[in-house]
From Swiss-Prot:
The keyword NAD applies. One of its GO terms (molecular function) is oxidoreductase activity, acting on NAD(P)H, quinone or similar compound as acceptor. Belongs to the azoreductase type 1 family. This is FMN-dependent NADH:quinone oxidoreductase. Keywords: Flavoprotein, FMN, NAD, Oxidoreductase. Homodimer. Binds 1 FMN per subunit. It catalyses: 2 a quinone + NADH + H(+) = 2 a 1,4-benzosemiquinone + NAD(+); N,N-dimethyl-1,4-phenylenediamine + anthranilate + 2 NAD(+) = 2-(4-dimethylaminophenyl)diazenylbenzoate + 2 NADH + 2 H(+). PANTHER family: FMN-DEPENDENT NADH-AZOREDUCTASE 1, FMN-DEPENDENT NADH:QUINONE OXIDOREDUCTASE.
């Protein structure tokens, strides 16, 4: 049985197009027997914003404040959750040409030297290996493979850095370019999702 971690990151609630697609994917994969865990980073599971105190605490050490200890424990939980699943599904709506701050914050909590990556004499090495990632990205315009897409290249870089190089992408484009374009973009994305195996 495949274990799947789904990360939602939209702040739009019921208006979220990425949430519609993620729910479609979850329903599709549940029929295949996948065990799914959902973390709603833009809703009920929003994380504290990583600031200087938290960033310092995530490096560990003997003299941590109570807040740093709490945030380090949270980071450990998020990393354990990441490592416990076979597939990571990331809902990545494009906000002002990049990912939501809530998703970037999750990355800041899990990207830890000595925990999810390490530095060697030959360069960095990811420690979260043998995983698969699926990116579901929604955008109002058409940006795929263009210079304005800072979502997919960035996420592929981050995932590769921690060891996840098997990355598939589902695009839903031109969603704000009229009703016909919206319906076409969502339909094509759902079709792509239907081809994915859990």
């Amino acid at each position: 049985m495949s274990k799947v971690l789904i990360l939602k990151s939209s702040i739009l609630g019921g208006y979220s197009q990425s949430a519609v697609l993620i729910d479609h994917l979850a329903s599709h994969w549940e029929t295949q027997g996948a065990a799914i865990t959902v973390r709603d980073l833009g809703g009920k599971d929003v994380l504290p914003m990583v600031d200087g105190e938290i960033a310092s605490g995530l490096r560990g050490g003997a003299e941590l404040s109570a807040r740093q200890q709490e945030m380090l424990a949270l980071s450990d939980t998020l990393v354990a959750e990441l490592k416990a699943n076979d597939t990571i599904v990331i809902a990545a709506p494009m906000y002002n040409f990049t990912i939501p701050a809530q998703l970037k914050n999750w990355i800041d909590f899990i990207a830890r030297a000595g925990v999810t990556f390490t530095y060697t004499e030959t360069g960095p090495k990811g420690l979260v290996e043998g995983k698969r990632a699926v990116l579901v990205t929604t955008r109002g315009g058409a940006h795929k493979d263009g210079p304005t897409d800072h979502v997919v290249p960035y996420l592929k870089t981050v995932l590769g850095f921690i060891g996840i190089t098997n990355v598939e992408v589902v695009y839903a484009e031109a969603l704000n370019m009229g009703p016909e374009a919206h319906d076409k973009g969502m339909s094509e994305a759902k079709h792509s999702i239907d081809q994915l195996k859990a």
